[in-house]
Design a protein with these regions (language model features):
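Structural and coupling elements of P-loop NTPases
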Residues: 1-693
Length: 693
C-alpha cells in the first residue's frame, strides 16, 4: 500500500545495547498484526536481526528497516545497533528519519548508549521521544530513571505515560493526557480505576501542563489562569513542543508482554513529525543552498542512507526519498559522480524480506538493487535539478590490525571481499601497506573486526587471521663520517673498477640528498648518477635494523677510475661500500613514527587519560572543549604505544570517549628500546648478512 507523506513516520530506534530496541521493534510489528508470532532476540528469530552473525551474537550489528502499518499510518522503524563498535548504524539511520525514539531499559536505566543517542538526535535537529521498556519487571524503577533523564537529557524531559501497580501487583499504565489508567490482557487494553500514586500524580500533571504552556502564548495565559487544558490542546501543544525541541515526551511499557504499545503507536503518530512539512536543505550544482519540498510533484531527490553487499544477490541500496518518487527504469543522476543510474524495480523492505513495489513516494523509505556507482551518502536526483544532500560524517577507524592469510593465494580474494564489505560499512578501512608488505584493516573496536573476520569467512569463503601491524621505523645518523669505497675485481678480459670518497652527514630532509664536489676529473661526470644510485640503493636499508634511511646527505668528494675497467655498475658498488663503511661510525639511530592524538573525553576522565598518555611515552600538548561538551586532549604519542588505546579509552569513559590520530613526524627511538626493535627486525629478515655485522 502506498502512503501519502503526511501518513508516514520515519523513526530511528536507538539506545544502549540490551535496552530492548529490537524487542520493541518486533513487538510493534506483532502488535500491528503483520506477524503471526513475535520473534525473540534470544532465539535469533527477530525480523531486525536477520544476519547470521546477529543471530549468533544475539545483538544488532547494523541498522535494519522494519515498516509497521497500523490504523492508516506507516511507521518506518529503523532499528539501530546499541554496541559502540557498530554505531555506524545510528549515523546511517538518523539521516533517513525525522525522529529518534530513545529506548531506555527499566532495569538498567539511562546508560551511555541512551545518552549518545539523545545527543546525536539533538545534534541533527531531530524530534526526540523516549520509551522506557521492561516496566513490568520487579526491579524496574521508572521514577528514578525519570530523575536521571532530567539530569542527563535536560529540562525538556516530560513524562506522558507512567507505570503503577494494582494491589495484586498487576502492572498498569497511567495516561497523563487523559488521566486514565489501563492494564493489559493479551496485549489488549482494559481500563481500570486510577491507582493512587500519592503526591506524584498532581506533580506530573502540573509539570506536563507547564511544558505544554511554554509552546504557545495562549496556552501560557490559560495555564496561569488556572484553567485545565483540553485533550486536543495537550496533544497539539505537545506536538509543537516536540517539533521545536522544547519537549521530550517519555512513554513506557513492556514490549515482551505487549503492554502500553497502543499508547506508544498512537502518540508516535500524533506527536512526531511527518516528512510532509519537513523541508530539507541541499546544495545545487553551483554549491548554493536549495530547499527541497516533500512532494511527488517535485523533481526526484533520494538519499542513499545504507548499502548492503551480498555476494549472490549483489548490492542493495536503501533510499530515503526526499522529493519526487522512485520508479522502475527511471534515470537519475548521482550528484557525487555525475554518472546516470538506471533504477531497477523499487523494493519495500521488512528486515531481510524484499517486496516489489510500483514506486517509492516522497517521504518514504525503500530500496533498489544493483546500482552501479551509488554508495552510502550519495544523492540520486533528476537531471533537471541536480542537488546534493549533505553526507554523514561517520566515526573514523581507531583500531588497526594486519591480515594474515590462512590459505596461500587468497590475498586477491581478501581484497575484493573487503572492498564489498567497505561498501556496506563506512567505518571499515583497508589498505595495502607497501612498506611493511601487510594488508591493514581498521575498525571501531575488537568486536567490529571480529565480525568482519566472520563475515569474510561466511559470506565470501575467505579465512583470515588478525595480528598487530608492524611499525614502519626509519633509520638516520647523528654525525658526519667520510669514507672511501673501492670496488676492484679482476677477471679474464675486462675487470671492474670504481673508487669513491663520500662524506655522509645528517640533514633536515626526509629523503636522501646527494651532492658532488669533485675537483678535476678524479671521477668522470658520467659516473655521478651511478654513485648517486648506489647511495640511494644502499640507504634503502639501515645498518641497525634494516629500515630505510632518512635525513642523510651524501657528498661525493673524490675518487678514481680506470679508463677500461670502470663502469656504471662498478661505481654503484663503490658507493655502497662507502655507505657500509661510514654508517656504523656516523652515530646511527632508529626513528619511530610519532602521531598526534586527539582524545575526546568527559571532563571527569581527563586525568586518567592524560596519565595513560604519559605512561605511553606521550607528551600532552594541551586541552580544549569540543562542540559536544567533551574535553579534547591533544598529545603526541609514539605509534607503537597506541596498540590497545581503543579499548582503554572506551573502558575508562564507559564508551563516551573517542579519539583520532594522525602522523606527525619521526623521532629518535629511546636507546633502551633499540634492542627489541633490532631483534624483531632479525626475526622479520630485515637484516642481510652485510648489514648484520
Amino acid at each position: 500500500m502506498k502512503y501519502a507523506s503526511n501518513n508516514i513516520r520515519n523513526i530511528l530506534i536507538a539506545g544502549h545495547a540490551g535496552s530492548g530496541k529490537t524487542t520493541l521493534t518486533e513487538a510493534l510489528v506483532y502488535f500491528s498484526g503483520a506477524a503471526e508470532r513475535m520473534g525473540r532476540v534470544e532465539d535469533g528469530t527477530t525480523i531486525s536481526d536477520f544476519d547470521p552473525e546477529e543471530a549468533k551474537r544475539k545483538a544488532s550489528l547494523s541498522a535494519s528497516v522494519v515498516p509497521v502499518e497500523y490504523e492508516g499510518i506507516k511507521y518506518n522503524l529503523i532499528d539501530a545497533p546499541g554496541l559502540f563498535d557498530f554505531e555506524a548504524g545510528e549515523y546511517e539511520g538518523i539521516r533517513a528519519a525525522e525522529s529518534v525514539l530513545v529506548c531506555v531499559s527499566g532495569r538498567s536505566g539511562v546508560t551511555v548508549g541512551a545518552e549518545k543517542a539523545f545527543q546525536l538526535a539533538r545534534k541533527n535537529g531531530k524530534a526526540t521521544m523516549v520509551f522506557v521498556s521492561k516496566c513490568d519487571l520487579e526491579n524496574a524503577n521508572y521514577f528514578k530513571i525519570l530523575e536521571d533523564m532530567k539530569i542527563k537529557f535536560g529540562s525538556t524531559v516530560c513524562p506522558c505515560v507512567v507505570p503503577a501497580k494494582l494491589d495484586d501487583g498487576t502492572p498498569v499504565y497511567i495516561n497523563l493526557f487523559s488521566q486514565k489508567a489501563f492494564k493489559y490482557e493479551g496485549g489488549k487494553q482494559v481500563q481500570v480505576d486510577l491507582p493512587d500514586i500519592g503526591h506524584r500524580f498532581q506533580g506530573l500533571i502540573e509539570a506536563m501542563s507547564e511544558a505544554i504552556a511554554e509552546t504557545d502564548d495562549e496556552l501560557m495565559e490559560k495555564f496561569f489562569g488556572g484553567e485545565a487544558f483540553t485533550t486536543e490542546e495537550i496533544v497539539e501543544g505537545m506536538r509543537k513542543g516536540v517539533k521545536d525541541g522544547l519537549i521530550t515526551p517519555v512513554f513506557c511499557g513492556s514490549a515482551v508482554n505487549q503492554q502500553a504499545l497502543d499508547m506508544l503507536l498512537y502518540n508516535m503518530h500524533k506527536l512526531l513529525p511527518s516528512p510532509e512539512h519537513n523541508s530539507v536543505l541541499a546544495e545545487d550544482a553551483n554549491g548554493e543552498p536549495v530547499e527541497l519540498t516533500c512532494a511527488e510533484s517535485e523533481p526526484t531527490a533520494a538519499y542513499v542512507f545504507k548499502t548492503v553487499a551480498d555476494p549472490f544477490v549483489g548490492k542493495l541500496s536503501y533510499l530515503r526519498v526526499v522529493s519526487g518518487k522512485i520508479t522502475a527504469g527511471a534515470s537519475l543522476v548521482n550528484a557525487r559522480t555525475g554518472e546516470t543510474e538506471k533504477m531497477g524495480k523499487p523494493l519495500t523492505v521488512m528486515g531481510k524480506k524484499q517486496t516489489e513495489a510500483e514506486s517509492i513516494g516522497a517521504g518514504d523509505i525503500g530500496a533498489v538493487a544493483k546500482l552501479v556507482s551509488a554508495k552510502t551518502g550519495d544523492t540520486l536526483c533528476d537531471a533537471s535539478r541536480v542537488v546534493k544532500l549533505p553526507a554523514p560524517v561517520f566515526p573514523k577507524p581507531s583500531l588497526f590490525m594486519a591480515v594474515t592469510v590462512a590459505k596461500k593465494g587468497d590475498e586477491g580474494k581478501i581484497s575484493s571481499a573487503l572492498a564489498r564489505l567497505m561498501e556496506e560499512d563506512p567505518t571499515l578501512s583497508y589498505v595495502n601497506n607497501a612498506e611493511t608488505h601487510q594488508q591493514i584493516i581498521g575498525g571501531l573496536g575488537e568486536q567490529h573486526l571480529d565480525v568482519v573476520k566472520a563475515k569474510l569467512k561466511n559470506k565470501f569463503g575467505v579465512e583470515i587471521g588478525l595480528e598487530a601491524p608492524r611499525i614502519a621505523y626509519r633509520e638516520s645518523i647523528r654525525k658526519a663520517c667520510q669514507k672511501q669505497g673501492r670496488h676492484k675485481k679482476q677477471t679474464g678480459g675486462h675487470g671492474q673498477f670504481g673508487d669513491v670518497v663520500i662524506n655522509f652527514e645528517p640533514c633536515d630532509s626526509e629523503q636522501v640528498v646527494f651532492e658532488e664536489k669533485v675537483f678535476g676529473g678524479s671521477v668522470p661526470k658520467n659516473f655521478f648518477p651511478a654513485v648517486e644510485k648506489g647511495v640511494r640503493l644502499a640507504a634503502e636499508k639501515g645498518v641497525l635494523a634494516g629500515y630505510p634511511v632518512v635525513g642523510l646527505k651524501a657528498t661525493l668528494l673524490d675518487g678514481s677510475y680506470h679508463p677500461v675497467d670502470s663502469s656504471e655498475m662498478a661505481f654503484i658498488m663503490a658507493a655502497k661500500l662507502a655507505y657500509k663503511a661510514a654508517m656504523p661510525e656516523a652515530g646511527p639511530v632508529i626513528l619511530e613514527p610519532i602521531h598526534t592524538l586527539k582524545a575526546h573525553v568527559p571532563n571527569d576522565n581527563t586525568g586518567d587519560i592524560m596519565g595513560d598518555v604519559t605512561k605511553r611515552r606521550g607528551r600532552v600538548l594541551g586541552m580544549e572543549p569540543d562542540e559536544d561538551g567533551l574535553q579534547t586532549i591533544i598529545a603526541e604519542v609514539p605509534l607503537a604505544e597506541l596498540a590497545n588505546f581503543t579499548t582503554f579509552i572506551r573502558q575508562t569513559t564507559q564508551g563516551r570517549g573517542w579519539f583520532t590520530t594522525e602522523f606527525a613526524r619521526y623521532e629518535i627511538l629511546p636507546e633502551m628500546l633499540v634492542p627489541a626493535v633490532v631483534k624483531q627486525a632479525r626475526k622479520l629478515g630485515n637484516l642481510d648478512e652485510s648489514a648484520d655485522d
